[in-house]
């Protein structure tokens, strides 16, 4: 079975490793920069922009690709799935119209409003920076300020966190030539719920919590994600059964709404939720696996990913097709020392021994047997254990054995940070 994976990050390395557990998979890759982990296991790699739809389509046809899995959001927005599907290649990933759930935040909020879907925060769309600035100045509370398009997870500024009111105004004024969305600031604990979706049915994956801030203690600028964790029971103590059921219901209602709009959703749906005093609210939807969250869930996937992909493509997915090991995971990203502001490329890094972990390469170069940093997140270790403490211990030990001009967040997955999350939610709801 010839499978094409589009994308070359840590998420895509995880997708490729999960697929190739099936000996019948013949893996092909298209990626903008060569990922040495993917290149090692692929039959052939096409080093080319994944958003160049005609070129990717030609590569797929040349190699008689049967199925494709699209990792990042940019090729979804470019219409890669539409082109591959038209050519008879089954895809794990939504068509462009359905991917708007991520690529156009205004569309997402409008869809939730139109169909009365729960969990939508109060929001306002502004067509000019001036309009946004005026609203920010007049609004009595705190707001999240974001462009409606793709920002790589780094486009939001939240009043009371990264900026004050004047800082929010200044940021809004920089967002020229795009629609700006202003949303009420949500207070609570974030969690990620990803699901496999076949157009009608969803099958959830373990809950994951990501850590966007660059530095320990959840401070510093937002990043693409410095690491994440999941628990052995696949839930969180700060997400009640009612909260969880509501989050599932919100995602199912969103899938139903997209089908009603004439754009059935097939692929991975990622719900980023803020669990507030009154229950989960949707921060955003993504139209693909999270990065790093994909590495947590795919590291403990026990069912065959190729079979899941076939059921997604054929519209025959059921809960019986998906199973995960009852293990905890902790993912810690190794990044260039000055990431995300001024990361330096070309620094040599060495990797030491690691136990009970999986290493996923991301934005990294391998030249003459030497690993070197590039300008984004370098690589990630996922520790796997019977408990969060055990998984964190393995991930931490592996990261400590990496040397070079790099850093990581040692607090991700620790008992102290986890206890802080639980206490915060308890205080919020007391």
From Swiss-Prot:
SMART domains reported in the protein's UniProt record? GARS_A, GARS_C
> Does the keyword Translocase feature in the UniProt annotation?
no
Top-rank taxon of the source lineage equals Archaea
Q: Which GO terms describe its molecular function?
A: ATP binding; metal ion binding; phosphoribosylamine-glycine ligase activity
Q: Where does Mg(2+) 2 bind?
A: 284, 286
Query: EC number(s) in its UniProt entry?
Result: 6.3.4.13
* InterPro entries (UniProt xref): ATP-grasp, ATP_grasp_subdomain_1, PreATP-grasp_dom_sf, PRibGlycinamid_synth_ATP-grasp, PRibGlycinamide_synth, PRibGlycinamide_synth_C-dom, PRibGlycinamide_synth_C_sf, PRibGlycinamide_synth_CS
Query: Catalytic activity, per the record?
Result: 5-phospho-beta-D-ribosylamine + glycine + ATP = N(1)-(5-phospho-beta-D-ribosyl)glycinamide + ADP + phosphate + H(+)
Q: Indicate which residues the UniProt annotation says bind ATP.
A: 136-192
Q: Which UniProt keywords apply?
A: ATP-binding, Ligase, Magnesium, Manganese, Metal-binding, Nucleotide-binding, Purine biosynthesis
Which cofactors does it use? Mg(2+); Mn(2+)
- For the protein in the UniProt heading, the enzyme class is ligase
Chain ranges passing through the membrane:
none
Q: Where is the ATP-grasp domain?
A: 109-314
**Protein residues bound to Mn(2+) 2:** 284, 286
The pathway where this protein functions is: Purine metabolism; IMP biosynthesis via de novo pathway; N(1)-(5-phospho-D-ribosyl)glycinamide from 5-phospho-alpha-D-ribose 1-diphosphate: step 2/2
An example GO BP is: purine nucleobase biosynthetic process
Q: What is this protein called?
A: Phosphoribosylamine--glycine ligase
What species is given as this protein's source?
A: Methanocorpusculum labreanum (strain ATCC 43576 / DSM 4855 / Z)
Q: Which gene encodes it?
A: purD
